[in-house]
Amino acid sequence: MVTEWARNYIDYSGLKKELKSRQSGADKTKEWDDVDESHFLKRLQEELSKVYNFQEAKIASIFSQLSENDQSVQELMENKKTAKDEEHQASGQAEGDESDDEDDELDAEIEAKFEEIEADLEILIADVHDLSKFTHLNYTGFVKITKVSPSAVQS
């Protein structure tokens, strides 16, 4: 469970407590009725919406960051090509020690920027992995809570 996302997970224990309190009632013989069903389904829908909205926001954020990284890579590649073309034109297409040093500096700068992008992508991969676990855990919670609800038993 990702601690920072805790409030976005299904409130399984809260839903289960609510089920138990509605089933037992004051006299311990209360039958599950339409009011109980309606209230439980409303709470279940609220939980589902909470989880869904969080997932959608995280997915949008991940895609946005991927797009930004893709754009950065495209710009780096274009800048590298442009800079090398300009260097070769300025030096009259001659390859010399000075030109090689400038190429090495340019390559080092580009390599450093690529490493930054790689680090960003590693974080995104971890976020995708965490989101996958989040989805699986919530799915399991929804399946379990609907199986133990009286409406599932009565059906």
Question: Predicted regions span which residues?
Answer:
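Activation on extended, non-transmembrane soluble regions of large proteins
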Residues: 1-155
